[in-house]
Amino acid sequence: MLDKACEDYPRKLDVEINGAWPLEILIPRFLTLSDHPSPKMRAHAISCLSSFVPIGSQSLFAHIDTFIACLFKRASDQDPSVRRHVCQSLVLLLASRPDKLMPEMANVAEYMLYSTKDRNENVALEACEFWLTFAEDPDLAPQLHPLLPKVAPVLLDCMVYSEDDLLWLDGESDDAAVPDKETDIKPRHYGGKAHGLDHEGDQQQERRVGAYGEELGDEDDEDYDDDDDFADEMSTEWNLRKCAAAALDVLAVRFGQDLLSVLLEPLKNKLWSEDWLSRESGILALGAMAEGMGLRLVSSPNPHNLLRRKAA
């Protein structure tokens, strides 16, 4: 509950009450809880602390060195939720207090590169946000430029579709020439409600069944509404792939030819790969970099529907 309050109302908590500042008591307590045996408590503590970074809370900044030391200590935590909040905190610090990270940037960069490749996509996404934030600040360009040879290829690899993406894209295959199966065209459910017919009085409501023969209750109607919106949500949801593409886009604007020199060989390998997923990620990368570098994509025949759409 306190975690949510810190996240939603950090400014309301960073106030003076009867001559005292509650955060001056809470911040040291959160720092102590970051070492709690429970990973859930550690994650909540770091999350609470990070909520006060964007507002420039002096109660937190009075302990900023201790906070950063706490993040470094928890960087290798076994719990992915804790690591995710560590990455998130480092992103917020980079945006608000880059001066505090620059002395340790070599170590921070190595950690964030490692985390960008984390198996847990939530951790990887937060780490990828670090590079997007880094690239968006023109004042940090001199510090980011030497990291391009390491950062850019990692971002390129992050643009390959994940297993979850592929599950969603299963319906995107080019199957116009394939006859529909019965399950493709069968209505989801039958019955009065499906056709806007209501039953009143003592009339027995018509039995409704789903596409697989199961009997449906009233609560299932909302489930179907949710299912209808699921594809749209998936297509617009911010994820690792989109974050990496956005970071490459900004890097292209910022560094232009220098970025292309770094990515020329990896891009060539992607575009000539026998794996269509790798080829697609290469095309996406070129598209992301095109505006910053003045590139133009030329459409060419390709056997996979998604590849044709990307190159068009």
What annotation goes with each model-predicted range?
Residues 234-281:
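Extended amphipathic secondary-structure runs
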Residues 1-10, 34, 45-56, 71-75, ...:
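Hydrophobic residues within the alpha-helices of tandem HEAT/HEAT-like
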Residues 3, 113-117, 121-180:
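Hydrophobic, aliphatic-enriched repeat segments that assemble into extended interaction scaffolds
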